Curated annotation (Swiss-Prot):
Stated family: Belongs to the type II (or gamma) interferon family.
Biological classification of the source: Eukaryota, Metazoa, Chordata, Craniata, Vertebrata
Subcellular localization(s) per the UniProt record: Secreted
Annotated Pfam families: IFN-gamma
GO BP field: adaptive immune response; defense response to virus; humoral immune response; macrophage activation involved in immune response
Originating organism: Anas platyrhynchos (Mallard)
Main location as per UniProt: secreted
Keywords noted in UniProt: Antiviral defense, Cytokine, Glycoprotein, Growth regulation, Secreted, Signal
A molecular function GO annotation: type II interferon receptor binding
Name of the protein this chain belongs to: Interferon gamma
Residues of the signal peptide: 1-19
Length: 164
């Protein structure tokens, strides 16, 4: 129950975050729907405050907007999975699910990036063939890393104009 309640809180944060960044979400209605969902899950129970947050701490570790979109795309998917297990005949749950599906569609590229990260973490480098492939790609990977850090440095160095 604690997990679900924290999830509901983070759902509120996600909806507000994307609402502020130009999405077509109706925050007033969503807040009412989230309040009804909190009542469904008895989110005012005292055990909600026990332990660590479910998602908030994870989002804090991602600082750049594009990075946050990757982690938020996964969190939105988790909310959709959670809502599928509830009574979808209730209008507030149906509305939240529709809005989350809209968000997920706008985040589809970010979700693919997340899947790439999962795929990389599951990659087994024990076979000789895959090790050969990895070694042959090493220089290209290092080049990409250098390009990334160089472009960041160029952006952070703003051109100074002469005030003559």
């Amino acid at each position: 129950m604690t997990c679900q309640t924290y999830c509901l809180f983070v759902l509120s944060v996600i909806m507000i975050y994307f609402g502020c960044s130009g999405s077509a979400l109706f925050l007033g209605q969503l807040q009412n729907d989230i309040d009804k969902l909190k009542a469904d899950f008895n989110a005012s129970n005292s055990d909600v405050a026990d332990g660590n947050p479910v998602f908030i701490e994870k989002v804090k570790n991602w600082t750049e907007r594009n990075e946050k979109r990757i982690i938020l795309s996964q969190i939105v998917t988790l909310y959709l999975e959670m809502l599928k297990k509830t009574d979808m005949s209730k209008p507030h749950i149906k509305n939240l699910s529709e809005q989350l599906n809209t968000l997920r569609n706008t985040l589809s590229n970010d979700y693919k990036k997340f899947r790439d990260l999962v795929e990389l973490s599951n990659l087994q480098l024990t076979g000789l063939k895959i090790q050969r492939k990895a070694v042959s790609e090493l220089f290209s990977v290092l080049q990409k890393l250098v390009e990334t850090s160089t472009s960041k440095r160029k952006r952070s160095q703003s051109p100074k104009r002469c005030r003559c």
